[in-house]
Regions:
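Peri-membrane helix termini and adjoining interfacial loops of integral membrane proteins
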Residues: 1-3, 75-81, 253-261, 338-346
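N-terminal signal-anchor module of multipass membrane proteins
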Residues: 1-40, 340, 375, 391-405
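Membrane-interface segments at the starts/ends of alpha-helical transmembrane spans
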Residues: 6-17, 84-91, 146-153, 182-191, ...
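Loop-to-helix transition at the N-terminal end of transmembrane alpha-helices
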Residues: 12-23, 46-58
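Membrane-interface transmembrane-helix boundary segments in multi-pass integral membrane proteins
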Residues: 17-21, 92-96, 191-195, 257-287, ...
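Transmembrane-helix bundle segments that line or gate the permeation/cavity pathway
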Residues: 24-42, 52-84, 88-141, 158-162, ...
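Long, contiguous internal "core" modules enriched in hydrophobic/ aromatic residues
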Residues: 43-44, 105-312, 317-318, 325-328, ...
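TerminUS-proximal long segments
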Residues: 310-405
Length: 405
């Protein structure tokens, strides 16, 4: 503790799990936006990541509410927001946004995209997996050209609807923080926009990591055309995100309100490691320099011509550093906004516990859970191009059966 703070400000109300929550939703939004680049904007270079991006978005979306539920004293009461909704509460209304994004956007798009494959996979096969896939077809076994065209059209329409839905899913988090007028660290009109672009950065970085790791685990060569395009998109998104954050910082510095003294003291003492070192230096500047040097951004072959193996290693390190930087961003927003007193004359401290519902182990378990969910989804719905490529020949044989039935 430093300076003068009120007695009820010594302990922080929002802890580590609340910082984990916007990090997870950001990954969901970023992964879905990347999928939309392939589906809606016909960016063929990133097509190999399309289905993987959808499954990753679903895996992280399933785990996203868990930090908030674990943070609540009575998580079973969370259903009250659906039974007795308060339309004037941004937090309550987000429950409906989450349900819309999960059931109407992600699940429907995945179903339309995989319906043909589910029908073919379930025919002539036995076992639990085949039974689950047969149930997932919902009885829609028509493989005619008309039905497949409808699947593609419906999937594209849902993706278009999903883009603003993804913005709303994560932008609302920045909206909640940015609308707190009494907190000078949070109150900013740029907060929702900064959250959105940082979500794009984290989502693209995650997909770059997943794409390379899954390729190596399957003993497949990494498609460098796709990896280079992902790195280029990551570079551009990172530039915009960093520019917006610097614009927000410059505006606060220029306004020099009465809170500037305590905020400067907080930056120099409490947030040196998480903001200056992790977020800005390792999480932003180092990745920007690395991507500018080796990725086809400034020049077609990069400023420094490097072999593919070294480029893959640099992309992997950049992806890891960006994840650390974006999580530090969420930490600095959530925790940093509670470290100074409302009197603007003192600072408190936040000590993370190892055990407990708001501890490091709980947060680590929640952060690892989406990978387990993604593994199960990949086993059920293989997203690899070679799995999809085998479908037409089998589907051609199965089509008369569907018409005869």
């Amino acid at each position: 503790m430093q300076g003068y703070i009120y007695p009820n400000e010594y302990e922080l109300h929002w802890g580590l799990l609340v910082a984990v929550y916007p990090y997870l939703t950001g990954l969901v939004a970023g992964a879905f936006i990347l999928a939309s680049l392939a589906r809606v904007f016909n960016m063929t270079e990133v097509q190999p990541t399309y289905r993987l991006s959808l499954l990753a978005a679903l895996a992280w979306l399933i785990a996203a509410p868990l930090p908030l539920l674990a943070h609540l004293g009575h998580p079973e009461r969370s259903f009250e927001i659906f039974l007795t909704p308060n339309v004037r509460s941004a937090m309550a209304m987000f429950g409906f946004v989450y349900a819309w994004y999960l059931m109407v956007v992600l699940l429907l798009e995945i179903w339309f995209d995989y319906r043909k494959d589910l029908v073919v996979w379930s025919r002539g096969a036995s076992g639990v997996l085949a039974l689950v896939r047969r149930v997932m077809t919902l009885g829609a076994s028509d493989l005619s050209d008309r039905a497949l065209r409808f699947d593609r059209s419906a999937g594209k329409l849902i993706t278009i609807i999903g883009i603003p839905s993804a913005f709303l899913l994560h932008g609302y988090v920045g909206f909640i923080f940015g609308s707190v007028k009494a907190n000078p660290w949070w109150s900013s009109v740029l907060m929702p926009v900064v959250f959105l672009f940082s979500a794009m950065v984290s989502g693209i970085a995650l997909m770059l990591l997943l794409f390379m790791v899954t390729s190596m685990l399957r003993s497949k060569p990494v498609d460098m055309r796709c990896a280079d395009k992902l790195a280029s998109l990551l570079f551009y998104a990172l530039i915009v995100d960093f520019s917006l954050e610097m614009l927000d910082f410059t505006q606060r510095l220029y306004e020099a309100e009465e809170s500037i003294t305590i905020l400067a003291s907080m930056l120099k003492s409490r947030l040196v490691l998480s903001l200056i070192v992790l977020q800005v230096s390792l999480g932003t500047i180092v990745p920007l320099v690395a991507l500018a040097a080796v990725a086809p951004t400034v020049k077609k072959e990069g400023l420094v011509k490097t072999p593919e193996e070294l480029r893959r290693l640099i992309y992997f390190m950049v992806g890891v550093l960006i994840q650390i930087g974006i999580f530090s961003t969420r930490w600095n927003v959530v925790i940093g906004g509670q470290l100074f007193s409302k009197s603007l004359r003192g600072l408190t401290v936040y000590k993370v516990e190892l055990l407990g519902l708001d501890g490091i182990l709980t947060a680590a378990a929640i952060l690892l859970l989406p990978f387990v969910i993604l593994y199960a989804l990949i086993k059920l719905l293989p997203p690899w191009p070679e799995a999809e490529a085998a479908m037409p020949a089998e589907g051609a044989e199965a089509q008369p059966m569907a018409q005869a039935s």
